[in-house]
Each structure stands twice: as structure tokens, then as C-alpha cells.
Amino acid sequence: QEEALKAYVASALPRSTRQIGAFIEREFGVIYESRAGLIALLHRLGLEYHKPEVVGRKLDAEKQQAFIEGYEKLRNALGPDEAVLFLDAVHPTHAARPVGCWAPKEEKLAIEQTSGRQRINIHGAIDLETGQTRMIEAETIDAASTIRLLEALEALYPFLAMIHVYLDNARYHHAKLVQEWLAQPGRRIKLHFIPAYCPHLNPIERLWGVMHKHVTHNKCYATSREFAGEVLSFLREKVPQNWPQLCDSITDNFRVIDPKDFRVLA
């Protein structure tokens, strides 16, 4: 019976213990009155509750490994007059983002719905060594906002000889305007492009998640201006100020994601 149960779970991937309990009752005539008891049985059989990861079809494990090795080589050889930053864009929307939380059993929780769904466009970068950030609010994220951000990074580090910037392969990051700007005499920025479809290799993606946890989850802002102010204040001021507490959540502890290591669901 236990082997049949394991085979059922492996094949059907049921989403709830109720489904599993119904299978056990239907096939073996056994009724589990206690959900905890059923969960204990599943654990004893080597079964766990999983949330599938989202894995890109075009992920290239070899390119990821080469990128990680190249990044580690650069970090290990980094001079005192150099810095490394990670760059990306984010588009927070002025909307309620409810998440689960503990509360008294008798209370019903709610978040006031916002009147609109305006979003803000932020082009930003972070230095993992210091927690320093530069966040540019823009009408659109494009080559112009990229150049504004790169200029802000040079202003942030006026005495460094080289600023290494890691970023994704968005078209505007490769734009002719950006290339022309980089070619100007005296520029001190070198771009390093992260392999395609690999947001897990850009730590600033984790910063966006931390931002939502602290600013948007289970919170309501009366106006889009108030919302934008809180988001930008967190990214520009609170992240550097609280970097010792936040740094463990925003790291360059990279890993290779290979689709071959997963059972990809159809």
C-alpha cells in the first residue's frame, strides 16, 4: 500500500492532503481523521510539499558556469581603485499586495484597495560590498536612463579607476547611444553582461524582493506619490543605512540552474 501511495503521488502530484486522503480512502478503505497524521506518513515515505521553480527553456548551464568563474576571478583580482555593481530595472505598481501572515483567529484581515494601478520605473544599481545604491526614476527605461544611471555611478565613485557593472541583455543596455557614451574619453565604466534568461545571476533581483517585503506587502498607500516616495526612500536611503541587516538576503552566492536537474512539468 505504501508503494502504491508513493507511486500515486509521484505520478499525479496532488496539490493537497485532501486529494491524497481521498485516494487512500478510495483505494485502501483507510480514513485519516488527522491531517497531521497523514503529513507524518508522507514524510516517512520520503514525500514533501514542493513549489516548482520557474526554469527557462533556454538556460545554458555551461554559460552560467563560465560566467560564475569569470565573476569570481574578477572579484579575487579586484584592485583597491575598482568597484563592482549590479544593475537592473524594476517597475513597482501602486496596488495592494496581500501576503499571508499570523493573526488572531477571530480577526478577518483586509487591505484597502488602491484607486489605480500607476507604476514607477526605476533603473538602479547596488554595490554588494557597501550597500550603496543609485536609483534613477524615469518616464521610460531606455538608453537614456541607462546613461543617466551610469553617470550617477561615476559620480558616486569619483576617485576609482574602474567601475565594473553587471547587467542583463536588455536591448537598451546594448544601444548605440550607450556604446557611444562608454567610448568617450575618461569613462571609467566597464559593462559585463549576464547570460540570457539568468535573473538568478543578478543579485539586484533579490533587492527588489526585499523591497516588496518591506514596502509593499500588506500595506496601503493613499496616493501613487506616497507609494513612489516610500519605494525610492527604501532603495536610496534605508538599504545603505541597514545594509548589515540586509546583506545576507542580497548576495552573490551564485548557482547554476540546469533544466536537466528538474522534472519539468508540462
Where are the predicted features?
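RNase H-like two-metal-ion nuclease catalytic core shared by retroviral integrases
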Residues: 61, 168-169, 176, 192-216, ...
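Major-groove recognition helix of helix-turn-helix-like DNA-binding domains
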Residues: 33-47
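RNase H-like polynucleotidyl transferase catalytic core
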Residues: 108-115, 183-203, 219-220
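C-terminal anion-handling pockets and recognition modules
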Residues: 37, 80-82, 204-266
